[in-house]
Amino acid sequence: MRRLLCSAIVMALSLAAFTSCSKKESFPKVAGDWNIVSVTTKSALIGSQAVDVYLSFAPDGSFTSYQKTGSSARYVRYSGTWKLTSGILSGEYADGSSWASSYSVSIEGETMTLTSSSTPAEVSVYKRAEIPDSVIAEAGNP
C-alpha cells in the first residue's frame, strides 16, 4: 500500500512541479502547488480507497507531498528532491529512496498530467491548487 501511495504522491508531485499558460509546453515548468483530480481511470481512487494528494514543487528542486487514503485519518507528509530532464520528472525521497517511477509531464492551462514509465502506465491528473493550511497543520511524517 505504501508503494502504491508513494506512486500516487510522486505523480502528484510531478504534476505540481509544472506550470504553464494556456497551451502545452514541450518542457513544462513544475514549480507550484497541485491537487490530484484522478489516477488512471479511477476518480482519485486506488483500488476502492479514496485518495487525496497535494504536491508542492519548489523552484530549488525540493518537493513536499501530502497524501491521505481512505484508511488514513490524516495526511502523511513526504519530502525530497525532484528534477525535470527533457520532459521527464524523477525524484528521490528524503530517506534516499527513489520514486517508484519516473513520469512524463504534460501541462495544459491549470491541469498537469503525469504518466509513469512503469508498465502498465499510471496516469495521474492534477489541478493547480493552493495547499490548505489545515492539510499542512494536520500532516504527520510516515
Where are these regions (language model features)?
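Lipid interaction determinants
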Residues: 18-79, 85-142
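Sec-dependent bacterial lipoprotein signal peptides
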Residues: 1-21
